[in-house]
Swiss-Prot record:
Organism: Saccharophagus degradans (strain 2-40 / ATCC 43961 / DSM 17024)
GO MF term list: GTP binding; GTPase activity; metal ion binding; rRNA binding
PROSITE patterns: ENGC_GTPASE, G_CP
UniProt-recorded name of the protein: Small ribosomal subunit biogenesis GTPase RsgA
UniProt cross-references to SUPFAM superfamilies, sorted A to Z: P-loop containing nucleoside triphosphate hydrolases (SSF52540)
This protein's encoding gene: rsgA
């Protein structure tokens, strides 16, 4: 069989990976020589150091150790599968394995930085308090679709829907949101972290996957995770009565192993990841029902706002495209234009 020729991009990628793994006898910060290369998983990020869990200890349970980062590696985030070398008590990460997915958010300068890697599914958590907004939900869905991460909508705090604490209009809004996203084919799970309702179904969904919980502050993400990880010390913030907004309680990124199988990455940065890195075309792809019909428009560069023979506008008019979804789609596209103008 003839040898397959590699493309220039493949050759460059191979050279880059090889350069990252050269000089395997690199010295530790204290001058000691390091051992052979080992595979590991980044389970926590603490400033300039990360905590790594070994992956290739077939006879022993995984070990955990602090590792320094090579300056030439770039960003290392929780969820990364890496190659490291160790001395007696710590190690140095010498390579990052290719990622299946990367969640990013802008830093204080507007530059995108990764916050989590190799995520399989996004648990979009919704509750009646604080009041949910479909625009935020649709932003999460658009990111998940483009990253090919499976989205699951988690409707939490069901106990409040049966109480007098919640206005009936908000309760109806939550019910309508659930109906809308179910009709689009998204999986919706009803839970109550307080009494444990729905957690068995949630455990089955989390098993054998690496998941991230996202959503507004105060919807109960940390409370749910604590129910699933009763032996872990996870900070929980109460809903603020004064401003009706939950406080961010997680201060660093960390990966937890569920006892029933599967992992969870929790990080304050993940809650803020956005759509700055998506183009209008990718936003269109992120709305599954718009994606399916946008190619039927008369004009290839159709903005789906005013053009004649626009399949998207026709779908809104005949009721096959929900008007709220269309409005959110247009708002997101406009927000990208605003960011580009500011840049």
């Amino acid at each position: 069989m003839a040898k397959r020729r590699l493309s220039k991009r493949q050759v460059d990628r191979i050279r880059e990976r090889q350069s990252q793994r050269l000089d395997t006898s690199v010295a530790a910060p204290d001058g000691k020589q390091l051992g052979s290369e080992q595979a590991g998983l980044v389970i926590a990020h603490h400033g300039k150091q990360v905590q790594v869990e070994t992956l290739d200890n077939s006879d022993d349970s995984p070990r955990r150790l602090r590792c320094h980062l090579r300056a030439t590696l770039g960003s290392v985030v929780t969820g990364d599968r890496i190659v490291f070398q160790e001395d007696d008590s710590s190690g140095i990460i010498v390579a990052i394995q290719p990622r299946s997915s990367t969640l990013v958010r802008p830093d204080s300068y507007g530059k995108l930085k990764p916050v989590a890697a190799n995520v399989d599914q996004l648990l979009i958590t919704i509750a009646c308090a604080p009041e949910p907004f479909s625009g935020l939900i649709d932003r999460y869905l658009a990111v998940a679709e483009n990253l090919h991460i499976r989205p699951v909508l988690l409707f939490n705090k069901l106990d409040l829907l049966q109480s007098d604490e919640i206005d009936s209009a908000i309760a109806n809004k939550v019910a309508k949101l659930r109906t809308l996203y179910t009709s689009l084919g998204y999986r919706c799970i009803d839970t109550c972290a307080k009494n444990g309702d729905g957690l068995d179904e949630l455990r089955n969904t989390l098993q054998d996957n690496t998941s991230v919980f996202v959503g507004q502050s105060g919807v109960g993400k940390s409370s749910i995770i604590k129910k699933l990880l009763p032996d872990q010390e996870i900070a929980i913030g109460a809903l603020s009565d004064a401003i009706d907004k939950g406080r961010h309680t997680t201060t660093h990124s960390e990966l937890f192993h569920f006892p029933f199988g599967g992992d969870c990455i929790d990080s304050p940065g993940i809650r803020e990841f956005g759509l700055w890195h998506l183009s209008p075309k990718e936003v269109t792809y992120g709305f599954i029902e718009i994606r399916d019909i946008a190619g039927l428009c008369k004009f290839r560069d159709c903005s789906h706002t005013h053009e004649p023979s626009c399949a998207v506008l026709n779908a809104v008019e005949d009721g096959s495209l929900h008007p709220e979804r269309y409005e959110n789609f247009q708002r997101i596209v406009q927000s990208l234009d605003d960011v580009n103008m500011q840049g």
